[in-house]
Amino acid sequence: MKLIYTEMSYSMTEILVNEARKAADQGYRVFYIAPNSLSFEKEREVLTLLPERGTFSIIVTRFVQMSRYFTVESSPSKQHLDDTTLAMIFYRALMQLKPEDLPSYGRLQNNSVFIEQLVELYKELKNAQLSVHDLTGLDHPQKQEDLIKIIELAETIMIQQDYNQDSPLQSFARAIKLGLLNNQLSKTVIVIDGFSRFSAEEDYLLSLLNNNCQEVIIGSYVSQKAYQKSFIKGNIYEASLHFLQDLAQKYHIKPVFAISNQVFKPAFSRLTQLFEATHDFSQVDWQLQKNDLDHFSLWQCHHQKEEIEHVAKSIRQKLYEGYRYKDILVLLGDMDAYQLQIGPIFDKFEIPYYLGKAEPMAAHPLVQFIESLERSQRYNWRREDILNMLKSGLFGCFDDSDIDRFEEYTQFADIKGFTKFSKPFTINSSRQYPLDFLNEMRQDIVLPLQELFKSQKQLGASLVDKLILFLKKIRLAENMQGLAQSQLEVEKNEEVWKRFTDILTSFHHIFGQEKLRLSDCLALIKTGMKSAQYRVVPATLDVVTIKSYDLVQPHSKPFVYAIGLTQSHFPKQIHHSGLLSDQERARINEIRNYRHFDIASAENSKKNHQTALSLFNAATKELVLSVPTVINETFDDLSPYLKELINFGLPLLDKGKNYLSYDNSDIGNYKALLSQIIAINRQDLIEMSDQDKMFWTVVLRYLRKQLRKQQLELPTSDYRLSTKPLSKEVIEVCFPKGIPLKLSATALTVFYNNQYNYFLKYVLNLNKTESIHPDSRIHGQYLHRVFERLMKDHTQEPFDNKLKQAIYHTNQESFFQQVYQDNAEAEYSLAMLEDIVRSTAPILQLNQNIQVIDQEKNFQLDMGNEILVHGIIDRIDQLSDGSLGIVDYKSSANQFDIGTFYNGLSPQLVTYLAALKQIAPHDINQLFGAMYLHLQDPKLDLVTFKQIDNTLVESIYKALTYKGIFSEVEKEHLSTGAYQTKNALYSNDELETLLNYNKYLYLKAAKHIKKGHFLINPYTSDGKTVQGDQLKAITRFEADLDMAQARRLVTLPAKEKKECFLTLMRKESHL
């Protein structure tokens, strides 16, 4: 064995490549071994250093891959074990054990996390060259007994199913020990680069290779100063020193110092020496030179997005200077925090990249499909799961529009559970859903699922066959091929599909002869899919490499950007969370010689120093170290390592926000520039965070309050949300000439509430999602229907009998049966409505001097100027003198207010009066009024009554009165009825004024509507708060910012309010 060490300023790879070339020139076969995470980059670096740029004599690979070169022909043809297969084997082993067989772990038999921990422990045992019987000295002896039962049973299953229990390195070591490879190894030289420690498995193999190979050469970075130190605790080279010293002691050799022809920039060497001096308690009498600082940059950004954008701009600048993507390496402090953001931002700047991390399959549509399938079976056809299956794009041949229509209907009809999905869809609404089409679609979905889900407990092989048949019926493979939109997606889908078929194969092999329920089968496949990962190789080598910073090696690339280096992530603190604690691992290691567990937490300090040293020397030209103030929505501090660099004299540059400038980095890329311009166009919306907006909104409110006390006024913000008018073509389609514009009292109210709301409801015809479950609209229909039946009943039956009959027959209508007999909640609502009917009905019995002459009367009122007002009058009454009036049923309290009417927010009663005047017989000229009847079950506070007497009854009937507009001429006839006429009497001239002004409101609104320009102007009554519909989710209206856009209502003092508003109406309606 030969041990080599060198300073950080030299290239260890060059030194080892020279050793490999010498061996190859002598006719030896050379294996150049690199760590798993670096083999790809190391191969490229080694080939670059070879003069011939390639050779068959030197193979750059990993330990595991090297073993296959020697054992591929002699290894037994057994099944391969991967993590998913191991998990299935442990699941099967636990199935065969009873809870009482496992005192410590009996309750965790079906826990997926516990099974994952068993897999990890089994792999650790293999790497540590230990068996489960070596787990002595545990905190609880019962743990070892349980683990022995589980693992031995699992190993028995592996033998029965012909799985290879040995790892590739174990098979290689066994072949060497048996002398099967002596001839080959005698002509082999092993070169090992990039290691600072070996696992027990690698350590054992190395001892065998040293005895049988021609030579084993190992290199590591250690300074001569550190090598001569006797005390190395806390030294930045502590990990490498321990590594070399242990090997030297074990194999009785002395490490030699070597140098390379290539010498890296002295700036990095000087920084390394300062870093070393800080940690070995020595001093240097010099500082970094001014030109050294040109090779280092320390950035500080506010949050991750800004940080990544600054890196992307800097990369674009490097390209402008003539460098290639492959010259750049990006290191991440927290891979999980940055992985989702860095891709879209690099795509925006058109930077090709390769993320050096296996991608989890959990977000792939195939995994989502399998998960939805499993949940559909487990939770009895839950609607969300069925829809998620369809939306994955892998179930059947359905268009997106068909799926949207199916989803809309199932939400409306509340279709959930097998019972409802299996029955034909029959319920419909005013939207007239295409039930024939939906039922065909329902059958295409239900039949294959029903066939699969009815499977009883049976052999696993039979379940897999049925699952495959189901997947064929729904055309899963064809749909999977149709998902890909690019070559990269095609490659990803191929990897995912291969993983999926491997999982099915493993399940069939392990559980083929075991009886299982379908739910267990789907759960196992789902767990395997969610935990699986895949990796896609980049199509070109000229890409920016992205990986975790703790996988970096010295002198990796000319330019290195390390981001996310906060105190929480640099250095990293690794802790085990498996079935064995670190203390238990340490006790096991004490009584074993060459076999031992790796205890990461025990090596955190020296490993972090080694990582920091590699990071500071990762670049050969320029190193950028960056830290965000906020990461994962949490404030974090500077890394202690970065603080050391600041003490060395490196300045911390605050990069600030990304503002558009004339720099090449800002305008040099079209796609990035376009996104910047779009962002600036929206600057008024996004320049502050939600937290900042909330803060300044509260401050502004407080400031206005203080100014008001001092009789000062703050100018209203001119910030406005603008809308564009409709094009002439659209106006002609929506409001064609010659066809009257159709309006209603409700539409007019919506228009004056907020013009944009009218545009959404009556121009775009946007509607809220319907539901079969009763809401206020359906409750109102029910109450209207009962009272309509009651008032039509002119028989001599007692009133109470008539009421019972009206309720009974209304309840028997098919629509109300579907709505109110669907569940207990709907039945309770029906009972409440019946109470309201019984409470309100007596008012109809008391008014014996009126006659109901019509109900649910449709009308069309011609307002002139091509305006047609339509509506339905709930009831038309006639007094004994022949005068007519209208009644509008309301499920909530309503009262006519002349101010509200003047502002266009309450035109209903006056509109109905105008319609009644038009449709009334010619011999009837007098109208006695228009009124609301609040359908309610009056609630009284009994505490306010001293005793239960007639006063209580009077209070109940006082709440049940007609409120609205009444004719002063009919005052005497109204006095005997339940009419609240106080402050509600109008003369005939005043009623005519109301009717004229009502017409003016319609004409004014119609004129504006036909122009096709709808403002975002919810109304405000006081100029401080907004009462109109703001539609925040659509318009982004904010009362404090957009008050200038709100429509200010006209308000008058209560004194002479009626007369003043009538005067205003006369002026405006005669303009």
UniProtKB/Swiss-Prot annotation:
Its EC number is 3.1.-.-. One of its GO terms (molecular function) is helicase activity. Disulfide bonds: none annotated. One of its GO terms (biological process) is double-strand break repair via homologous recombination. InterPro entries: ADDB_N, DNA_helicase_suRexB, P-loop_NTPase, PDDEXK-like_dom_sf, PDDEXK_AddAB-type, Restrct_endonuc-II-like. It comes from the Bacteria. Its cofactor is Mg(2+). Belongs to the helicase family. AddB/RexB type 2 subfamily. NCBIfam families: rexB_recomb. Heterodimer of AddA and RexB. HAMAP family: AddB_type2 (MF_01453). This is ATP-dependent helicase/deoxyribonuclease subunit B.
